């Protein structure tokens, strides 16, 4: 009786954790999905952003009580402006996707939405973590020895 319960709890924890990318695996994936140089933003800057926003975790979420919105996924894309989570007041959903799409292990939709975000006038500066940890920094370490 205890073994099936333990197995069930183990599987649940794996499901909730999602995929945590290895650094170079994420760098190769982002390059393949066209983020390297998109809107003038280097792959190293995207990697720095993903490191500080989610620690490369596809299932990362962060609730913002002030705006009653939530940041979702590897890029921590916000439900106020970019996706629909069904609970954020006055959500815009500029990426035209459910926020749950940003939590998938396949980050194709997250990358497409990140491209939409960075295409706005604020560009990469839309992300607080990028401004705090990546702007005007040597971000080459995030792609070092990845062959990208």
Curated annotation (Swiss-Prot):
Alphabetized GO MF terms: lysozyme activity
Intrachain S-S bonds: 24-146, 48-134, 83-99, 95-113
Cross-referenced SUPFAM superfamilies: Lysozyme-like
Keyword annotations from UniProtKB, A to Z: Antimicrobial, Bacteriolytic enzyme, Disulfide bond, Glycosidase, Hydrolase, Secreted, Signal
Main location: secreted
Family annotation (Pfam families): Lys
Localization per record: Secreted
The keyword Disulfide bond is annotated on this UniProt entry: yes
InterPro entries registered for this protein in UniProt: Glyco_hydro_22, Glyco_hydro_22_CS, Glyco_hydro_22_lys, Lysozyme-like_dom_sf
GO cellular component, one term: extracellular region
Subunit-level organization: Monomer.
Family: Belongs to the glycosyl hydrolase 22 family.
Function: Lysozymes have primarily a bacteriolytic function; those in tissues and body fluids are associated with the monocyte-macrophage system and enhance the activity of immunoagents.
Protein name, UniProt field: Lysozyme C
Organism annotation: Leptonychotes weddellii (Weddell seal)
Gene that encodes it: LYZ
């Amino acid at each position: 009786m205890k073994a099936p319960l333990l197995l069930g709890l183990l599987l649940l924890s794996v499901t909730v954790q999602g995929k945590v990318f290895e650094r170079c695996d994420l760098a190769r994936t982002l390059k393949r999905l066209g983020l390297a140089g998109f809107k003038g933003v280097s792959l190293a800057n995207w990697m720095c952003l993903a490191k500080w926003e989610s620690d490369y975790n596809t299932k990362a979420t962060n609730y913002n009580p002030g705006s009653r919105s939530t940041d979702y996924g590897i890029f921590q894309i916000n439900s106020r402006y970019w996706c629909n989570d069904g609970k954020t007041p006055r959500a815009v959903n500029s990426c035209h996707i459910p926020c749950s799409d940003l939590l998938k292990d396949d980050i194709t939709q997250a990358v497409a939405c990140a491209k939409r975000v960075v295409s706005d006038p604020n560009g990469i500066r839309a992300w607080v973590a990028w401004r705090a940890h990546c702007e005007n920094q040597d971000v080459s370490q995030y792609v070092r020895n990845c062959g990208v």
